[in-house]
């Protein structure tokens, strides 16, 4: 998939960069695999905002995606590549030989008409799902299960993949996209290859309105608010924060505070922690 740029006909097209969607072949989703989904708009069951800057946007239908790949030994043909408004990755529509249809995350390099299969005896080819014990060392995988039978939970976004580093006993060491090296049970399933549509990371919305179409509302800096609205607010002119470091709207430390529990039981499965990003690379802003 290529990147498309625009001439500066308007201020919104000056910096607009989008993907050309040449890989997408289906115009409408499979009716049997879509359901209506109530949009929470960042609210919980009491109507209280728990996630700010959410709301509005275009209407969506949720595509039911098969993250388990549990139809073992039944071959399927790739019928189409569809767009999914709920994620950056595209979806591949599979037609199984027993008549069932399912969506999966479209791996990079997949082709229409290609045959895919899942199971411990599946060939080592892109798009096939196998247990980690049957995948060779050094292979790139995605949609990795954290617990057997629960479905893929890791390496699912566009362009992401994990690498099989080592095998020892009942566990397999995986290098995750965050550079963390973690042990996973050998019976957990993963899909060979990396997730497609990797060029989406090079896109630029170009204008604020396109972000509103995606259901994202404006982010207002705390330093320009009143003191009753944010701990950073108040003062005359462009006043400093007045604290030792930035905090959230609720007074908790922000931008760099570790949030993982020290005594979390799964810490023993983490062989190497992820590389911490700096504030500059993280794109930190005055929350």
Swiss-Prot record:
Record SMART domains: Ribosomal_L2 (SM01383), Ribosomal_L2_C (SM01382)
Write one Gene Ontology MF term: structural constituent of ribosome
Gene Ontology cellular component list = large ribosomal subunit
Start and end residues of each stretch annotated as Disordered = 221-287
For whether the record's keyword set contains ATP-binding, the answer is no
One Pfam match, given by its short name, reads: Ribosomal_L2_C
Q: Where is the composition biased (Basic residues)?
A: 258-287
**Could you tell me the Gene Ontology terms of the biological process aspect for this record?**
translation
Keyword list (alphabetical) reads:
Ribonucleoprotein, Ribosomal protein, RNA-binding, rRNA-binding
At the top level, the lineage of the source is: Bacteria
Q: Which PANTHER family match?
A: LARGE RIBOSOMAL SUBUNIT PROTEIN UL2M, RIBOSOMAL PROTEIN L2
What does this protein do, in the record's words? Answer: One of the primary rRNA binding proteins. Required for association of the 30S and 50S subunits to form the 70S ribosome, for tRNA binding and peptide bond formation. It has been suggested to have peptidyltransferase activity; this is somewhat controversial. Makes several contacts with the 16S rRNA in the 70S ribosome.
The record's family statement is: Belongs to the universal ribosomal protein uL2 family.
Against NCBIfam families, the record matches this protein to: rplB_bact
Subunit info here reads: Part of the 50S ribosomal subunit. Forms a bridge to the 30S subunit in the 70S ribosome.
Name of this protein: Large ribosomal subunit protein uL2
Which species? Prochlorococcus marinus (strain MIT 9313)
What is the organism lineage in this UniProt record? Bacteria, Bacillati, Cyanobacteriota, Cyanophyceae, Synechococcales
């Amino acid at each position: 998939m290529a990147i498309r740029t625009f001439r500066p006909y308007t201020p919104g097209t000056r910096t607009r960069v989008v993907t050309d969607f040449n890989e997408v072949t289906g115009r409408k989703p499979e009716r049997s695999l879509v359901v209506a989904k109530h949009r929470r708009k960042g609210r919980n069951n009491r109507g209280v905002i728990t996630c700010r800057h959410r709301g509005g946007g275009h209407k969506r239908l949720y595509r039911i995606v098969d993250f388990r790949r549990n139809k073992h030994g039944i071959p399927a043909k790739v019928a189409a590549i569809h767009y999914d408004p709920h994620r950056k990755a595209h979806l591949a529509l599979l037609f199984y030989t027993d008549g069932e249809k399912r969506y999966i995350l479209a791996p990079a390099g997949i082709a229409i008409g290609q045959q895919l299969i899942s199971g411990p005896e599946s060939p080592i080819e892109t798009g096939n799902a196998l247990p980690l014990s049957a995948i060779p060392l050094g292979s790139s995988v995605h949609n990795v299960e954290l617990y057997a039978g629960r479905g893929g939970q890791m390496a699912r976004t566009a362009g992401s993949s994990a690498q099989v580093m080592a095998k020892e006993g009942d566990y397999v060491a995986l290098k995750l996209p965050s550079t963390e090296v973690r042990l996973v049970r050998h019976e957990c399933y993963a899909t060979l290859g990396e997730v497609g549509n990797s060029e989406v990371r090079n896109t630029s919305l170009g204008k604020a309105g396109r972000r509103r179409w995606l259901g994202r509302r404006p982010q207002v800096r705390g330093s320009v608010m009143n003191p009753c609205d944010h701990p950073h607010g108040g003062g005359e002119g462009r006043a400093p924060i007045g604290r030792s470091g930035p905090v959230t709207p609720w007074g908790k430390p922000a931008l760099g505070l570790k949030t993982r529990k020290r005594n979390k039981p799964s810490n023993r499965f983490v062989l190497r922690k992820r590389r911490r990003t700096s504030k500059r690379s993280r794109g930190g802003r005055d929350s």
